[in-house]
């Protein structure tokens, strides 16, 4: 996007880690939303030295708008290899936009049990909420037009990068 370069994803990840470190204990459950959120969660899990195994969610079947926005049911496996009942959780996503992905993720989480709390970490908050969802931990807040999209990609070396496109 000319005149509005996207922030460096690696720097945002470091900022996110620094925000989370004082508030996230080793017994906190960390769950990444496929695909970009899972990549971020992998790095956060390692850097925060969490003891609880990393969890991942694919919310494809829990979304209420997949037909409207053209989501393909390229389903990945959801895996939560720990008990969530009564546990403090951090749900991780790459880009927070309408809030619908987060709503879907919370619906799926409650199928696994009743956590003590759920906090949200997002690499980027781009505004545009349709549901009352807010992240506790945010790498950066940016403003994009409704016809602009932002996506997290990962190269073969594991380096993360934000890329923009238009509808």
Predicted regions, residues:
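PRPP-associated nucleotide enzymes
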Residues: 1-167
